[in-house]
């Protein structure tokens, strides 16, 4: 029984480590409705490392297509969790653009699609409003882009729950 309790507590502590707000807030002004998501790999070696070595081996997918596919999944899963929020996540370049952008900054990614990323919320002037770290477990089969997409969709779902917590609809 003690062993089960210890394992349960260990599981909770590890899962709480996988998601945390590092600084700032994720509360948006009351008039803001849209939140744009985009990649930002400038603070990491991610783009340089994976475009040259990994992405050419992704069964016909290339990095620009993989990025687009993955971010669409993140937006979809975020919006599922944002249902109780006044915020709608949108893709970069869509007609509906918000004054705030949430940048996905990949930190770690393995061949199974397990990932850890920093998510940075910035306003229209580029000022950092909030910073959080989320991890997502990748998939079990498919192309590397699909495995990566599974992991980022799970992280997007957690992120949607966080943004909902900060931006609940007023009654």
Language-model regions, residue ranges each:
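Generic secondary-structure microfeatures
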Residues: 39-41, 79, 105-110
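A structural "domain/chain start" motif
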Residues: 18-73, 165-171
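Surface-exposed short loop/turn segments
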Residues: 85-142, 146
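C-terminal/domain-edge helix-coil "capping" segments
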Residues: 19-28, 127-171
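Bacterial Sec-dependent N-terminal signal peptides
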Residues: 1-24
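Generic marker of residues within folded, mature protein domains
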Residues: 6-10, 27, 94, 109
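Mid-chain, structured segments of secreted extracytoplasmic proteins
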Residues: 65-93
């Amino acid at each position: 029984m003690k062993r089960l309790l210890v394992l349960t507590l260990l599981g909770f502590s590890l899962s709480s480590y996988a998601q945390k707000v590092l600084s700032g807030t994720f509360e948006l002004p009351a008039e803001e409705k849209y939140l744009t998501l985009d990649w930002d790999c400038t603070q990491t070696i991610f783009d340089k490392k994976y475009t040259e070595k990994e992405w050419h081996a992704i069964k016909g997918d290339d990095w620009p297509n993989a990025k687009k596919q993955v971010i669409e999944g993140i937006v979809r899963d975020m919006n599922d969790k944002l249902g109780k929020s006044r915020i709608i996540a949108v893709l970069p370049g869509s007609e509906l653009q918000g004054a705030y952008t949430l940048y996905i900054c990949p930190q770690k990614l393995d061949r199974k699609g397990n990932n850890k990323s920093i998510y940075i919320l910035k306003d229209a002037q580029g000022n950092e409003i909030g910073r959080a770290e989320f991890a997502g477990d990748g998939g079990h089969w498919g192309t590397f882009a699909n495995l990566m997409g599974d992991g980022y969709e799970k992280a997007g779902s957690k992120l949607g729950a966080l943004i909902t917590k900060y931006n609940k609809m007023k009654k």
